[in-house]
């Protein structure tokens, strides 16, 4: 029997000659279990025999086969997976064959922690030889579930631990061409830009990435992901963000278009709180969107909050609070900037 295949014609362990010497160890639920779990007969017997070989620490071929059957019945049993690793090492099994076993189990259990942990263990043992296979495996998972956290976490681990960075930015590009709203792909793109040893780091990549992101914003200004990505490109360097002419340009483009203005207004508000000196064009764009009930003399930041109260009604209380805190936020930003300058001078 295949180690991961439990069929309707399954032969009970008690009827298998090669298991005749093993005395099964039943589960001990105590003398008076309150709500005992109604296990199937096959599951109970399999686990009874597993407990027997586990207690005996039997590291044999039949033990490996048994763990395969137990995992098929319950892929989430971490004790079975752990013992399987012990047996695999003891037997010196070809781990590439073990990956095939995991592939079959993972097909219907793509969010199972134990399976991903076991796969990482295998990849770590196989080293650089596993890179291509693991990257392709995660691609297969993404074709079914583009936001599978386990697969993304595994892919990032593979890149950092084993390599394979060469085509990763191009892969992110392809994912975003397929779906510009794929926030997981945006996250991976940022991971690659900031972590890849081949690209030179965030500062070196910033201009190219800003160009790409600005184009994405112009194409879909209602998409929050590129706006967040743009912020990330200036992490710990807010002044460069404030001074970037491309940013001001895309803000004006969006605010004067017929598209959703919410993300652009939020972005502009934050820039103003970090001492952005807005152009007359930006001021005029905001004035056009400002409700008639607002005073013409109202500060630009408060005008933006008033617009957002109408454009983003779900957060109306938040924008009302931001309006009341604009002055405080501006002072905090200015104080932080002064402290940063003093630190540089020292």
From Swiss-Prot:
PFTA repeats lie at residues 59-93, 94-128, 130-164, 165-198, 205-239. Signal peptide: none annotated. Its cofactor is Mg(2+). Heterodimer of an alpha and a beta subunit. GO terms for cellular component: CAAX-protein geranylgeranyltransferase complex; cytoplasm; protein farnesyltransferase complex. GO terms for molecular function: CAAX-protein geranylgeranyltransferase activity; protein farnesyltransferase activity; protein geranylgeranyltransferase activity. One of its GO terms (biological process) is protein farnesylation. Belongs to the protein prenyltransferase subunit alpha family. This is Protein farnesyltransferase/geranylgeranyltransferase type-1 subunit alpha. Its EC number is 2.5.1.58, 2.5.1.59. Disulfide bonds: none annotated. Essential subunit of both the farnesyltransferase and the geranylgeranyltransferase complex. Contributes to the transfer of a farnesyl or geranylgeranyl moiety from farnesyl or geranylgeranyl diphosphate to a cysteine at the fourth position from the C-terminus of several proteins having the C-terminal sequence Cys-aliphatic-aliphatic-X. Keywords: Magnesium, Prenyltransferase, Repeat, Transferase. It catalyses: L-cysteinyl-[protein] + (2E,6E)-farnesyl diphosphate = S-(2E,6E)-farnesyl-L-cysteinyl-[protein] + diphosphate; geranylgeranyl diphosphate + L-cysteinyl-[protein] = S-geranylgeranyl-L-cysteinyl-[protein] + diphosphate. InterPro entries: Prenyl_trans_a. The keyword Repeat applies.
């Amino acid at each position: 029997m295949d180690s991961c295949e439990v069929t309707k014609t399954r032969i009970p362990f008690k009827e298998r000659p090669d298991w005749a010497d093993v005395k099964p160890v039943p589960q001990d639920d105590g003398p008076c279990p309150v709500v005992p779990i109604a296990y199937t007969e096959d599951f109970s017997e399999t686990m009874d025999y597993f407990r027997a070989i586990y207690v005996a620490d039997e590291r044999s071929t039949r033990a490996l086969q048994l763990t395969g059957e137990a995992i098929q019945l319950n892929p989430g049993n971490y004790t079975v997976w752990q013992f399987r690793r012990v047996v695999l090492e003891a037997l010196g099994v070809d781990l590439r064959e073990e990956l095939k076993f995991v592939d079959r189990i993972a097909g219907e259990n793509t969010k199972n922690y134990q399976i991903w942990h076991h796969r990482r263990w295998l990849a770590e043992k196989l080293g650089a030889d596993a890179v291509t296979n693991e990257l392709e495996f995660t691609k297969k998972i993404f074709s079914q579930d583009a936001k599978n956290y386990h697969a993304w976490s595994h892919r990032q681990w593979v890149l950092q631990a084993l390599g394979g960075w060469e085509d990763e930015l191009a892969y992110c590009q392809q994912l975003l061409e397929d779906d510009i709203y794929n926030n997981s792909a945006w996250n991976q793109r940022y991971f690659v830009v900031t972590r890849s040893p081949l690209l030179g780091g965030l500062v070196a990549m910033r201009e190219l990435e800003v160009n790409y992101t600005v184009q994405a914003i112009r194409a879909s200004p209602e998409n929050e992901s590129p706006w967040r990505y743009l912020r990330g490109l200036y992490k710990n360097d807010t002044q460069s963000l404030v001074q970037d002419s491309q940013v001001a340009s895309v803000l004006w483009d969006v605010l004067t278009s017929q598209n959703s203005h919410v993300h652009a207004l939020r972005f502009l508000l934050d820039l103003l709180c970090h001492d952005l000196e807005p152009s007359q064009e930006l001021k005029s764009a905001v004035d056009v969107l400002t409700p008639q009930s607002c005073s013409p003399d109202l500060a630009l930041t408060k005008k933006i909050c008033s617009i957002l109260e109408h454009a983003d009604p779900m957060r109306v209380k938040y924008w009302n609070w931001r309006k009341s805190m604009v002055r405080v936020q501006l002072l905090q930003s200015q104080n932080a900037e002064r402290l940063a300058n003093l630190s540089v001078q020292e």
